[in-house]
């Protein structure tokens, strides 16, 4: 396979990424249709752009400027009193940056000490159950053996109901478990070990999108990392077989793509609805 670089990382489809894997977890049929170009996702780009706006700032001045050059039209207001400045949806991004940039604990963790070897946006790769997998890490401290993932989230401590844990939990718990970040970090830890032969400690720097952003350094316990990676291992071969055309993609029957393909050929009873897993 072609060597992975910053230039070809997003174009090379010979490797599976965590985000692409999660699309297939949600609905194989939709993910396959997206890959083939049969289906085009209509979604709000704001959360992704906001996250990348914050990420690029802490990567480097050059990375942030490049991001603004490529996406400025989407982030900057063209009319009104904010013309030339950030749109209201992205003003919180500056608040999130301000909350972190002068925080000594964050800077020590994310950027390391002057003598540390720290790499930003490090490409990692390897094989999971024989499937080629790649990823990009926000910040890796090669000197001290840890890596950091910067996550923007609605809130860290506001209480929410967790369907998985069946109790109220801080919002960060739902964010991590629902988006599978424990699996993502477990995966990246495994890929780093394959590349370096060393065990790295993963951390999340969480920053909230609240009017006054909250922030926290989170450590995912080993049992959660292992559980998340085990789930990926249990499903990744089937996903790769679907991608390669060796297996027909399954429909979830409930996403927008599946609804677009739906034909009314059966009657659903009230008890069917009550007993369904959906």
Kindly give the residue locations of the regions a language model identified.
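Short histidine-centered catalytic/ligand-binding loop motif
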Residues: 43, 82-85, 161-179, 223
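Conserved catalytic cores of phosphodiester-cleaving nucleases, focusing on short active-site segments
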Residues: 135-171, 188
């Amino acid at each position: 396979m072609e060597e992975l670089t910053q230039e070809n990382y997003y174009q090379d489809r010979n490797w599976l990424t965590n985000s692409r894997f999660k699309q297939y977890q949600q609905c194989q049929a939709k993910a396959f249709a997206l890959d083939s170009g049969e289906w085009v996702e209509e979604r709000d780009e704001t959360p992704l752009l906001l996250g990348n706006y914050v990420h690029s700032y802490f990567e480097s001045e050059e990375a942030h400027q490049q991001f603004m050059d490529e996406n400025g039209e989407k982030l900057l207001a063209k009319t009104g009193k904010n013309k030339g400045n950030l749109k209201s949806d992205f003003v919180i991004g500056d608040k999130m940056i301000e909350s972190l940039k002068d925080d000594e604990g964050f800077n020590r963790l994310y950027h390391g000490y002057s003598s540390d070897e720290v790499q930003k946006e490090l490409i990692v790769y390897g094989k999971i159950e024989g499937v080629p997998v790649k990823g990009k890490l926000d910040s890796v401290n090669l000197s001290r053996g840890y890596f950091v993932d910067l996550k923007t989230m609605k809130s860290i401590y506001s209480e929410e109901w967790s369907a998985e844990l069946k109790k109220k939990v801080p919002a960060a718990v739902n964010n991590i478990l629902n988006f599978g970040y424990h699996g993502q970090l477990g995966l990246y830890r495994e890929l780093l070990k394959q590349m370096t032969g060393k065990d790295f400690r993963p951390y999340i720097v969480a920053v909230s999108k609240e009017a006054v952003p909250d922030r926290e350094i989170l450590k995912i316990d080993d049992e959660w990392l292992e559980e998340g990676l085990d789930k990926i291992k249990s499903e990744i071969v089937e996903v790769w077989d679907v991608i390669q055309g060796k297996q027909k993609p399954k429909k979830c029957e409930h996403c927008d793509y599946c609804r677009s393909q739906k034909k009314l050929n059966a009657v659903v009873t009230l008890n069917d609805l009550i007993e369904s897993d959906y």
